[in-house]
C-alpha cells in the first residue's frame, strides 16, 4: 500500500499539479515562517543574535512541520486505515512540484513563441529572483532552462528521496527546509544573518539528491535521444561552477544534454552577479530547449520514483 501511495501521488502531480486555489501545506509553512521571522527580528538585534534566532526559527519551522505531519497521519490512521492512506497520498502529492514547475515554464515559453517579450519577462519574474526587465529572448530561455533544471532536484528528486528515507512526514519536513531557503536564504543584507542557517541546511538536505540528479538526468538524456554521455561528462566537469554546492549538478547535466551554455552574468536585487558559465555553447539556446528540459525533468523524475520503489522493495525483502 505504501508503494501504491507513492505512485498515485506522483501520477496526481503529473496530471493536475497544484491547483491554485486548493489548500497547500507550503502556503501554511510560509505563513509560519513569516510569523516566526517577525518574532525573531523583534527580539534579536544585531547580526549575531539574528544568526542564532535564524537557527531557532529553522528548528521550530522544520520540527513543527514534521510533528504536525506525523500527528495528522497518525490520527487519520486511527480513524480508519483507508482514511490514513488517503491522507498519506495527499501529503506526498503536495510535496511534489513537477507539474507546477512545467506549467510555470510553459507560461514563459508561450508568449516567447509569440514574440511577446514583455509578457514573457513578466511571467519569468514570477519564478526567478533575477531582474527580468531587460532580458532578451536567449537570456529568457536560459533562465527558464536553469530554473527547471535546478528545481528538478528541489521539486521532485529530493522530496522522493526523503519520502524513501522517512515517509510522508520527512518529505514534508524537507519542504519546510526548502521553503525556508526560498524565503530567507539570501546573501544580501536583509537576510544574510537570519537566513544563514536556512541556506546552509538547504545545502545539506540537497547534497545527495543533487548528485543523484546528475546520474538520473544523464540517463534521461539518453532515453530522450539527446547525448547522455555528454550530459554526464559536462555535468561532472562543471559540477562546481556555481556559488551553491548543489545547483550546478543538474544545470550542468542539462546543459551537456542540450549542447548549450547556462550561467553567466545576471542582475539580482539591483546588483550584477557574475556567475561562471556552465556547459559548452555548441549551438545557440532556443525556445525549444524549454520543452526539452521539461521532458528531461519528467523522465528523470520517473527514474527517481522507480529507483526508490526498487530500493524500498529490496529493503523490505531483506527484512
Swiss-Prot record:
Q: In which pathway does it act?
A: Cofactor biosynthesis; adenosylcobalamin biosynthesis
An example molecular function term from Gene Ontology annotations:
threonine-phosphate decarboxylase activity
Q: What is its main location?
A: membrane
* InterPro entries, sorted: Cobalamin_biosynth_CobD/CbiB
A biological process (GO) of this protein is: cobalamin biosynthetic process
> Transmembrane residues, as ranges?
56-76, 82-102, 153-173, 204-224, 296-316
Against Pfam families, the record matches this protein to:
CobD_Cbib (PF03186)
Membership in a protein family: Belongs to the CobD/CbiB family.
Its recorded name reads Cobalamin biosynthesis protein CbiB
Query: Which taxonomic lineage is given here?
Result: Bacteria, Pseudomonadati, Pseudomonadota, Gammaproteobacteria, Enterobacterales
